[in-house]
């Protein structure tokens, strides 16, 4: 089985592996992870200041559709996307209850996944856009790769956080190739 997560879902993947082991899991794929830790703290001085995170939450709370419109371009990076794709992703966010959005953001920005990442023992592919404004690659993707022994980091130039939607034409083949490579090695 291959576990695939995007954004906060990457935290779910690594937390699952750290708690339940990898007996049934052959590999993992982490897309634009928010791991290992976003918020600034005493032992994470390069993180995002909590005041900035609070301001982002306040902006979201004040006007969800406006927040989506303001953040659409950074979400997709330099990848050209159709207005329909922007509308589809925006609709998913707008249709999510506000309390769920806020609590999810608070959880994924303050949860420390460093120990979880260090315990991952399955082959892991990390794909991250170099223009990811939601989870900057130097704060998240590169550090995640450094904490998982033997992981592979694939950087998409010009891609943002929404690479699953904007860059699916290159993402899907890369994920399938990784799964195929790992299956061939296991055979």
Region spans (language model):
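Flexible "cap/lid" loop of the alpha/beta hydrolase fold
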Residues: 14-62
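Short beta-strand/loop motif that positions the catalytic acidic residue
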Residues: 120, 126-128, 132
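Acidic catalytic loop of the alpha/beta-hydrolase fold
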Residues: 130-135, 162
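Catalytic nucleophile serine of serine hydrolases
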Residues: 7-8, 32
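Conserved alpha/beta-hydrolase catalytic His-Asp/Glu region
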Residues: 39, 43-47, 58-118
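Catalytic active-site module of serine/aspartate enzymes centered on a nucleophile-bearing elbow/loop
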Residues: 149-187
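Short alpha-helix in the alpha/beta-hydrolase fold that links the catalytic acid
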Residues: 106, 113, 122, 137-145
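Alpha/beta-hydrolase fold nucleophile elbow
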Residues: 1-7
